[in-house]
């Protein structure tokens, strides 16, 4: 079962997909926000085409852990998305993933490679990978 990771922003939505085994997350695409219904349609098309069975949405929290206005926007959009799909959704704390993604993109040596890697999709992959890794950690008795 593939999992879909979303990094929802005001201008773009970063999208990541896991492999079918749910082990590795990779950046997939970026949706440039235009209209909410078109954004939802683009995501539901990906869900259908890629046979997604789980959605992980990055929830932007403040450093103190509180939810701000951006987190509320993400939750509102996610609720609307949920009304268009039966795929279960989970939230994952995304504090600092965009910053880490930007630093990783800057660390890439060539300009040509940097241009191909968009930090929004990479942030979505980091969010999704954290979720996948968390599910595989051995539980101590």
Feature annotation, model-predicted:
Residues 2-4, 11-141:
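Phosphate- and other anionic-substrate recognition elements at nucleic-acid/protein interfaces
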């Amino acid at each position: 079962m593939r999992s879909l990771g979303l990094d929802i922003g005001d201008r773009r939505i970063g999208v990541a997909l896991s492999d079918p085994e749910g082990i590795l997350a990779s950046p997939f695409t970026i949706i440039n926000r235009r209209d909410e219904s078109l954004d939802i349609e683009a995501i539901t098309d990906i869900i259908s085409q890629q046979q997604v069975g789980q959605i992980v949405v990055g929830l932007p929290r403040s450093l103190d852990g509180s939810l701000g206005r951006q987190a509320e926007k993400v939750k509102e959009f996610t609720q609307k998305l949920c009304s268009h799909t039966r795929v279960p959704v989970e939230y994952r704390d995304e504090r600092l993933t965009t910053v880490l993604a930007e630093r990783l993109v800057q660390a890439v040596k060539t300009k040509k490679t940097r241009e191909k890697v968009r930090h929004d999709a990479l942030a979505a992959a980091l969010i999704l990978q954290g979720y996948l890794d968390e599910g595989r950690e051995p539980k101590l008795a």
